[in-house]
From Swiss-Prot:
Gene: fadE28
Note on how the cofactor is bound: Binds 1 FAD per heterodimer.
UniProt GO MF annotations: acyl-CoA dehydrogenase activity; FAD binding
InterPro entries hit by this protein: Acyl-CoA_Oxase/DH_mid-dom_sf (IPR046373), AcylCo_DH-like_C (IPR036250), AcylCo_DH/oxidase_C (IPR009075), AcylCoA_DH/ox_N (IPR013786), AcylCoA_DH/ox_N_sf (IPR037069), AcylCoA_DH/oxidase_NM_dom_sf (IPR009100)
Family according to the record: Belongs to the acyl-CoA dehydrogenase family.
Name of protein: Acyl-CoA dehydrogenase FadE28
Source organism (scientific name): Mycobacterium tuberculosis (strain ATCC 25618 / H37Rv)
UniProt cross-references to PANTHER family, sorted A to Z: ACYL-COA DEHYDROGENASE, ACYL-COA DEHYDROGENASE FADE28
One GO BP: response to pH
């Protein structure tokens, strides 16, 4: 395994960085051509793959950008590229390059990324409740996992109701209730189960979290290098250096497992063990790393207009969406008990 970025991955990362260094908005990503990168060439995109989307989302996270990028490119485009037919891709991905938003309804009350969703799909009708659905009101299409199918529906379809719910980072998130929503045969992803969609979702969330932790580490290291107490930079104090080292270790280990998961999925290898570790490591190690970064910023960390707030709050939201460390440890332990 060689996780050094390829020329194409580095080019994608450079494009994202060049855009976000000027403006971290969704509009900037659209105008800069970032949203077109994973879209098939026949639809006006660049046709990059999972490796490159992972690099893209890591850079979005590194810059602390709170946008529909994860929902659209990670939770929407990535599974559709792998699991949808060409005709379905042509319909669902047509507007992405120009800023169209996609999302996925995967979580349910009390269940994070369930492989056996309670949402039912019977007789062409979809019924159930989904939580933590990002940017649903803006979305053109929504990927939905059900008990025996994975389907794509419009958030404005008859029978869909949405209620906005609060998030730590202020992004749009909704509870979606579906009551007998009609789904045409052409909107069903053939022979696709929730398990595979959840694997891809965890992988792209991990790539985004990788960037968030790395970005917070860089921000904090720069801050303590320039902030002085007793006439010396904070970074020269042994305690500060030791705490930064803890964040560095968390960042590097998350980076390793996130890249390993992307690699294994892209190469069609079994990624189950790595996904289990990724889910647990992000939920158990990223929040404490954010707490250390927040602490080392002192009073500056309390300023919601300062970038540290975006990193910390987004990690809190991701941890919640993944079910938290206890849930992830239970899943990892259950997998280990089978081997």
């Amino acid at each position: 395994m060689d996780f050094d970025p390829t020329a194409e991955q580095q080019a994608v990362a450079d494009v994202v960085t060049s855009v976000l260094e000027r403006d971290i908005s969704w509009e900037a990503l659209v105008c800069g051509g970032v949203t077109a990168l994973p879209v098939p060439e026949r639809l006006g995109g660049d046709g990059v793959g999972l490796f490159e989307v992972g690099a893209l989302l890591t850079e979005v996270g590194r810059h602390g950008a709170v946008t529909p990028a994860l929902a659209t490119l990670g939770l929407g485009v990535v599974p559709l590229l792998e699991l949808a037919s060409a005709e379905q891709q042509d319909r669902f991905l047509a507007g992405v390059a120009k800023g169209g938003v996609l999302t996925a309804a995967l979580n349910e009350p009390g269940a994070a990324l369930p492989d056996r969703p309670a949402t039912s799909f019977v007789g062409g009708r979809l019924s159930g409740t989904k939580v933590g659905v990002g940017y649903a009101e803006q979305a053109d299409w929504m990927l939905v996992t059900a008990d025996n199918a994975v389907v794509v529906v419009s958030p404005t379809a008859d029978g869909v109701r949405m209620v906005r719910t609060p998030t730590s980072n202020g992004s749009d998130e909704y509870v979606m209730t579906m009551d007998g929503v009609a789904v045409a045969d052409c909107d069903i992803l053939a022979d696709v189960a929730a398990h595979r969609v959840n694997q891809l979702a965890l992988a792209v969330m991990g790539a985004y979290a990788d960037g968030l932790v790395a970005g917070a580490l860089r921000l904090t290291a720069d801050y303590v290098a320039n902030r002085k107490q007793f006439g010396k930079p904070l970074s020269t104090f042994q305690t500060v250096a030791a705490q930064l080292a803890e964040v560095y270790i968390a960042s590097r280990t998350i980076d390793l497992v996130a890249k390993s998961v992307i690699w294994r999925l892209a190469e069609d290898l079994d990624a189950g063990d790595d996904l289990g570790v990724l889910g647990y490591w992000v939920t158990s190690q990223a929040p404490p790393a954010m707490q250390i970064c927040h602490h080392l910023h002192g009073g500056m960390g309390m300023d919601v207009t300062y970038p540290m707030h975006r990193y910390y709050s987004t990690i809190k939201d991701l941890t919640r969406l993944l079910g938290g460390p206890s849930h992830r440890l239970e899943l990892l332990g259950a997998r280990c008990s089978l081997t």
